[in-house]
């Protein structure tokens, strides 16, 4: 059977792939999908406090606190080459609170935590993995964003901190894509909207979601692998839905 390659000649099936947040709902589904679909890939997945439940000879687990600059620097220094980095880590609610319904609920600490998890890690990954990504024939850096981070698409309001952190993430990715035209001309930077998935992150907010609009993470992961396999320089700097449609920034 012929090896699957993209337009650059990269053997996708044997790619070196890093999945950040690989023990989460979407992240763990993506790890499983990549191992199944790309039978020769070498996969590295990170977890925050508890490791993933999957054991596989081509899967390497790494504990990583994405809020800590030093940990990301140390993690990145262990890689000679990386083809894909997919950041699936995200924060919507936790001990510091949840999405605000109105401005009266706004809290600076909650906004800071959203930015520390939803925005800054992608910039640190781009910075510290730059050399390893440059050695790929077709590097991809993609982060799971959210439609609520689209300024043009914001019609409902609310959720100040989450929206702000995702909008900032989108700006970071768009800006990085412009730099990559010169520094990584064979590469692609992408923001990914996963839709609403049946995960711990979205579970408190699923009551108003139609069953047909609530996705199994395995479905989203399959769509993401389809999309990632088609990304290249001509598609860099865009905001994609799980099914390959463009969203406005």
Regions found by a protein language model. Give the residues of each.
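Conserved active-site helix of classical SDR/Rossmann-fold NAD(P)-dependent CH-OH oxidoreductases
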Residues: 32, 123, 167-178, 187, ...
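Conserved Rossmann-fold cofactor-binding substructure of NAD(P)-dependent oxidoreductases
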Residues: 64-81
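Conserved glycine-rich Rossmann-like NAD(P)H-binding loop of the short-chain dehydrogenase/reductase
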Residues: 35-55
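C-terminal helical subdomain
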Residues: 187, 191, 199, 203-249
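Catalytic loop of short-chain dehydrogenase/reductase
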Residues: 91-95, 99-115, 134-183
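Structural signature of the Rossmann-like NAD(P)-dependent dehydrogenase/reductase core
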Residues: 19-20, 87-88, 139-146, 188-191
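N-terminal Rossmann NAD(P)H-binding glycine-rich loop of SDR-like oxidoreductase domains
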Residues: 20-35
């Amino acid at each position: 059977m012929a090896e699957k390659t993209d337009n650059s000649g990269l053997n996708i099936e044997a790619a070196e792939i890093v999945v950040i947040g690989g023990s989460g709902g979407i992240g763990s589904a993506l790890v499983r999908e990549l191992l199944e679909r790309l039978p020769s890939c070498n996969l590295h997945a990170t977890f925050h406090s508890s490791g993933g439940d999957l054991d596989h000879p081509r899967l390497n687990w790494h504990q990583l606190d994405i809020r800590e600059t030093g940990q990301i620097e140390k993690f990145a220094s262990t890689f000679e080459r990386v083809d894909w980095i997919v950041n699936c880590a995200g924060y919507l609610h936790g001990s510091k609170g949840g999405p605000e319904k109105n401005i009266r609920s706004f809290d600076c600490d909650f906004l800071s935590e959203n930015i520390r998890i939803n925005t800054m890690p992608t910039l640190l990954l781009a910075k510290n993995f730059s050399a390893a990504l440059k050695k790929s024939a077709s590097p991809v850096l993609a982060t799971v964003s959210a439609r609520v981070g689209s300024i043009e698409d914001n019609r409902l309001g609310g959720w100040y901190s989450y929206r702000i952190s995702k909008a900032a993430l989108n700006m970071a990715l768009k800006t990085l894509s412009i730099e990559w035209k010169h520094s990584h001309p064979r590469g692609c930077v992408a923001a990914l909207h996963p839709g609403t998935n049946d995960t711990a992150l979205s579970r408190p907010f699923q009551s108003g979601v139609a069953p047909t609009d609530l996705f199994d993470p395995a479905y989203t992961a399959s769509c993401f692998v389809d999309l990632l396999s088609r990304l290249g320089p001509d598609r860099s700097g865009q905001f994609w839905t799980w099914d390959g449609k463009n969203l406005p920034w």
